[in-house]
Every structure is written in structure tokens, then in C-alpha cells.
């Protein structure tokens, strides 16, 4: 089996892993519904760009 030519130190390994991050989703205020929703997606009430385009699932 192949072996690494050099031992990777903990510092080198950890510096490489510093770029693995979670990013927060972009959220915008929807003036039509008064709720926050993700950009470029249909809101939970069925609105997209201020127009009703889908039926919302109502909890009973």
C-alpha cells in the first residue's frame, strides 16, 4: 500500500480544515406576509415576489 511521503503535523492539518465552515442562510423580510423567508424561494404562505403562486399547507 502507498504511504505518505511526509507526516502531516496537527498544525498543518488544522490549518487546512479552518475553511470548513457553515454559512448562515440568507433571509429576507417579506412585506406581503410579514414573515421572514429565504431569498429566491416560495414563502410558507405560498407567496413569491409578492404574488400568490401556491396554496399554503394549513395546520389543523
Swiss-Prot record:
The keyword Ribonucleoprotein applies. The keyword NADP does not apply. SUPFAM superfamilies: Zn-binding ribosomal proteins. Keywords: Ribonucleoprotein, Ribosomal protein. Residues 1-20 have a biased composition (Basic residues). One of its GO terms (biological process) is translation. GO terms for molecular function: structural constituent of ribosome. Transmembrane segments: none annotated. One of its GO terms (cellular component) is large ribosomal subunit. Residues 1-22 are annotated as: Disordered. It holds the Pfam family Ribosomal_L32p. It comes from the Bacteria. Belongs to the bacterial ribosomal protein bL32 family. This is Large ribosomal subunit protein bL32. It comes from Streptococcus agalactiae serotype V (strain ATCC BAA-611 / 2603 V/R).
